[in-house]
Each structure stands twice: as structure tokens, then as C-alpha cells.
């Protein structure tokens, strides 16, 4: 059976090296560190675009080798995951990427250039340009790397190379062959156990394997994810959201991203997986932080698991290993955009303070306001009721507080409706301050003395 699979999906292999190991490592310690990362997930990625002249100079200076500018477009899964975790630094935050190697940091800077950092929406008629779309246009899965270092082959400056499968079935002669996936990031592991695989004998029932990129960490809250899943109350915490800004009539915000893997059935496609993951993200998101927030999810097929009795998989608490895996990555990602309409009730913030300038980097939400995203629904309902009971006098008295003015300017907010009703029904001129001046002074309040009034009359006479 293995020979039949081998003839159907021939193996194409090559030697690869990762030049980000020029810095922060000594001698062959870099190979040990990288091999440890590859034992958790041995999927490799390629940067499909060319480095700019500025980036090439930076890489040459950081790595002290010109080889990094020509062969530095290969990255392992560890660097790819680090890029996703650093996506909350795309905006006007600090650009220090201390946990990225020089090559990974260079690719990160190339993907999120000035346009990506400032112009999230290019034009109202052009689709939303977010971080996920920028990643899918620059990085694609390109290889399955064998975790063992080739001791007999070395690249430039003595850096060891790795065997990598570019396409086809995993080679039989490799002692550590197979696809390695993180257990905590893989959906539907039970589908490729031996008891389940024995049910499939038809060649048309090959199980596809997909990879997805989405919002952190809402996408990692499915019930069938690995051996455990994140509790719902941590699905959306404020620490993953740092800022938001508005361009045109849309709002984008900076958030960490994450990736996951999906073991599908023979009739599942990228679109069906995309739909399921979108439901998981919407269901497990605690609340919307800002009105009409736009999010993205991308899915790509990386290969299939042949339906035969020799196909086996084993997993522990960290790694899922699929031995007879056929690596057939697609060239394009399937991407979707969605908006969670469950707007945060206490966050009915007017966005008129955001300038209608494309890429207004000065329009940033306060981080303390973002922390309200983690409050319970019951507390939010109580706050909404208190807001409905406020009088115009209370609003004016607290106008110097944070967010009071934006909320009052919101046409859809309850306070704005009270202002409008008072202006139309109780006053002729519509001046709310005139209405308040006609009210009696509060008890204990001091009025103008007679002496002071007399002084005013004398001055007016003069």
C-alpha cells in the first residue's frame, strides 16, 4: 500500500537552511534550538516577495553575511508564530521586536510597511486591508522539514542544513518522517486515530489538513481543539487589544493573531472550514470592543492524510505526528472578513473625534477603555440602566470626565436623545444653558451680595 501511495504522490525534497541563526547563537547551539522547535511543528514557510534595498542592508549588517539577503526567505513555524503574536505592534506602538530574529523581523517590517501601519482602509470601495490579508499575500506554507540536522552537509559559515519535503508523501527512509503539529493548536485529532482510519478504505476519502490564521485567542476556543480548550471567559481579554483607529466609516484595531490546524473530512473544503472557524470566533468572543469592528480569518490546505490502514498518527501533550502525510500545499489562501454585530453596550462611543483622514494614527482609543471588554454581561446591563436614568444636569456636571463628551455627541446614545427632546420641548431657543440658569440655586448656595450688586450698578452708570 505504501508503494502505491509513493507512486501516486512522488516525493520532492531539497536542502534548506535558516539564516536567522547567524545572531544570538554560538556554533551549533543554533541547530539544537531550531531542531527543538521543529520537533513541535516542522512546517516551513517562504517569503514570496523580494526584500527592499533598505532591508537587505539591515540584514547584511545584522547577520554579517550577504547570504541572508539571498537565502533568508525561509522561516520555520516558531518564527511564523512569533510574527502572529507581534501583530499587536503593527500600529503606532513601539516597533521593538526583541523576540524576533533578524530575518523574521525583516519580513515582519516588509509585510507591515507604512501603508499597512497607517492606511488600514485605502478607499471605501476597496476591500479592508488588514494584518491577515497582508500575511497571506507574503507568506505561504512551502515545506515540511525533517527535525534532524544533516551532519555531513553544511551551508555558508558552517550552518547545518535540513532535509525538507517540498511536495509528495513523507519519505520512508527518514527516521523522523511525518508532519509534526502542535496538539493544542489542532482541531479534530480523533479523526486520524487508527480506529477511525480503518473505516476508510476508499481512495476518495483522503482526509485533508488545513491551516488557519485568525484573531487571538478567540479561534482557540473550540470544544474539539486538542486535548483541552480555553475557557470562554478568557476568549477575549483586553491584553490582546492595544488600540483602535477609524478610517472613513470603518474601524480597525491592533490585535494579536494566532494559527491553528484543522483535520477535515473528505468532503470539507477551505470555505467550509472558514465558516466553522468564523462561528467559533463569534460564539466565543466575549464582546465587541468598538462598534463594527472588522476581523479576518484565512485558511489554506497544506495536504492530505491517505486513507489506508498503514496511515497512522500518534500524539502526546505537545505534538501530533502524522507519519504518512502527503504535502500538497495550495498556492493561495481562502480569506473572509466578518463583523461582530454584538456591540459592547457601554461602549456606544461616538467616533466623530476621529478625523476622516485615511490612516489617522493619532486617533487611538485609551487602553483603560479597552479593559472594559472583560467585564461581565450583568455589570454591563446595570451600567446601561444607570446611563438611561441620568439627567441633563448630571451630564453637564460630569462633562469633564473621560468619554463623557464623545458619548454625549453620539446621535444614537440615550443621552443624546434626552438632549434633543429637551431642546425641542422645553426651550424656544434650544439653549440648554439658559434652561439651567432659570433653575433655583441649590440649598446652601451663595448668591450675589447687595454690595456687589450696587457696585455693578455704579459701573454700568459710568
UniProtKB/Swiss-Prot annotation:
Q: Where is the composition biased (Basic residues)?
A: 443-453
- Identify the stretch(es) annotated as Disordered: 405-462
Q: Where is the composition biased (Basic and acidic residues)?
A: 415-431
Superkingdom field: Viruses
The protein depicted here goes by the name Uncharacterized protein ORF112
Amino acid at each position: 500500500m505504501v508503494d502505491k501511495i509513493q507512486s501516486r504522490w512522488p516525493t520532492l525534497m531539497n536542502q534548506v537552511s535558516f539564516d536567522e541563526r547567524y545572531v544570538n547563537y554560538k556554533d551549533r547551539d543554533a541547530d539544537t534550538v531550531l531542531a527543538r522547535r521543529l520537533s513541535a511543528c516542522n512546517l516551513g514557510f517562504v517569503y514570496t516577495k523580494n526584500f527592499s534595498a533598505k532591508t537587505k542592508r539591515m540584514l547584511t549588517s545584522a547577520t554579517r553575511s550577504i547570504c541572508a539577503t539571498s537565502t533568508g526567505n525561509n522561516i520555520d513555524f516558531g518564527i511564523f508564530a512569533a510574527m502572529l503574536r507581534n501583530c499587536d505592534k503593527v500600529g503606532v506602538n513601539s516597533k521593538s521586536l526583541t523576540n524576533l530574529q533578524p530575518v523574521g523581523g525583516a519580513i515582519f517590517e516588509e509585510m507591515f510597511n507604512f501603508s499597512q501601519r497607517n492606511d488600514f482602509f485605502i478607499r471605501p470601495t476597496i476591500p479592508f486591508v488588514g494584518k491577515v490579508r497582508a500575511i497571506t499575500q507574503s507568506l505561504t506554507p512551502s515545506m515540511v522539514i525533517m527535525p534532524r540536522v544533516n551532519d555531513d552537509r553544511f551551508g555558508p559559515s558552517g550552518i547545518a542544513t535540513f532535509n525538507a519535503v517540498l511536495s509528495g508523501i513523507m519519505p520512508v527512509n527518514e527516521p523522523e518522517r511525518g508532519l509534526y503539529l502542535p496538539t493544542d493548536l489542532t482541531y479534530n485529532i480523533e479523526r486520524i486515530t487508527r480506529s477511525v482510519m480503518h473505516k476508510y478504505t476508499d481512495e476518495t476519502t483522503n482526509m485533508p489538513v488545513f491551516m488557519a490564521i485568525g484573531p487571538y485567542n478567540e479561534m482557540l476556543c473550540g470544544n474539539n481543539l486538542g486535548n483541552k480548550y480555553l475557557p470562554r471567559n478568557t476568549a477575549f481579554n483586553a491584553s490582546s487589544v492595544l488600540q483602535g483607529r477609524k478610517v472613513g466609516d470603518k474601524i480597525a484595531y491592533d490585535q494579536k493573531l494566532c494559527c491553528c490546524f484543522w483535520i477535515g473530512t473528505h468532503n470539507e473544503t477551505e470555505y467550509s472550514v472558514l465558516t466553522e472557524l468564523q462561528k467559533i470566533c463569534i460564539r466565543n468572543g466575549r464582546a465587541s470592543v468598538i462598534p463594527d469592528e472588522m476581523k479576518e480569518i484565512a485558511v489554506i490546505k497544506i495536504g492530505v492524510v491517505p486513507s489506508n490502514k498503514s496511515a497512522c498518527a500518534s500524539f502526546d501533550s505537545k505534538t501530533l505526528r502524522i507519519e504518512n502525510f502527503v504535502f500538497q500545499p495550495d498556492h493561495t489562501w481562502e480569506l473572509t472578513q466578518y463583523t461582530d454585530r454584538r456591540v459592547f453596550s457601554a461602549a456606544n462611543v461616538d467616533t466623530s473625534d476621529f478625523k476622516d483622514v485615511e490612516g489617522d494614527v493619532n486617533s487611538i482609543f485609551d487602553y483603560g477603555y479597552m479593559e472594559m471588554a472583560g467585564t461581565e454581561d450583568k455589570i454591563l446591563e446595570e451600567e446601561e440602566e444607570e446611563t438611561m436614568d441620568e439627567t441633563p444636569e448630571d451630564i453637564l456636571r460630569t462633562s469633564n470626565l473621560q468619554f463623557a463628551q464623545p458619548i454625549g455627541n453620539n446621535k444614537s446614545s440615550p443621552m443624546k436623545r434626552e438632549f434633543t427632546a429637551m431642546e425641542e420641548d422645553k426651550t424656544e431657543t434650544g439653549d440648554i444653558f439658559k434652561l439651567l440658569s432659570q433653575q433655583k440655586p441649590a440649598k446652601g448656595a451663595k448668591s450675589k451680595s447687595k454690595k456687589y450688586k450696587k457696585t455693578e450698578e455704579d459701573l454700568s452708570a459710568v
